[in-house]
Amino acid sequence: WQTVVDMGWPAAAIAEEYGGLGLGYLELCVLAEEFGAALIPVPFVSSVLQATEAIKLANDEQQSAEWLPGLASGVTIATLAFAEGLAGRSWSDRPLARGGNGRLHGCKTPVADGLAADVAVVSAVSAEDGEGFGWWLVPLEQAGVTRQAEDAVDRVRKHATLQFDGAEAIRLGRPGAGREMAARLMDIAAVLT
């Protein structure tokens, strides 16, 4: 990971004002292609292509200023936690995890790079979301978060189950916009991977 960070790759598509290189999706796509070709076992997909993009999509100046510099420098590793380990569920289904009052409850599995990540972007439902759902930023080094390694078909990236029991959580983006953000993230992932 340090070699990847030294080359500036986590900063590729982050704006210069947040410590990034200010490049676009074309450059990010080239990097993603090289990672895929070499099967490099680092959290590039989960941290750079998924979680960082989710934070950027939320378009919140304060959250961008707080999280993007650490992600650009590679000091902070993030992951996207939306799967709930239930057969037949889609990324666009309402999550079972519950958020509200700055706390999160529920379970996400499998979570790529869930053991290496410092923070997770988690899909969850709260009273404010109406019929939709939202996204939450959850620092993973805290009481209320339990991580357990999981066996997965993907042998390149380690997967985990993340259990949230009243974990401190910060809303990412506007309430009820989870499905819209998820659809955009899936579009981005389809292009970049």
Q: Which positions does each model-derived feature cover?
A:
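Internal helix-loop-helix
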Residues: V5-A65, P69, S73, D113-A116
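Buried hydrophobic positions in well-ordered alpha/beta secondary-structure cores of metabolic enzymes
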Residues: G8, A15, L31, D60, ...
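Short glycine/proline-enriched turns and hinge-like loops at secondary-structure junctions
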Residues: L23, S90-S92, D113-A117, E131-G132, ...
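Glycine-rich beta->alpha junctions and the first turn(s) of the following alpha-helix
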Residues: A37, V145-T193
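Short beta-strand-to-turn element immediately C-terminal to the catalytic PLP-Schiff-base lysine
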Residues: K56-N59, V122-V125, L137-L140, Q163-D165, ...
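A short, Trp-centered hydrophobic/proline-enriched beta-strand micro-motif
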Residues: G74-G85
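A short core secondary-structure module
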Residues: A81, C107-T146
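Cytochrome P450 C-terminal beta-domain/meander region
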Residues: S90-H105
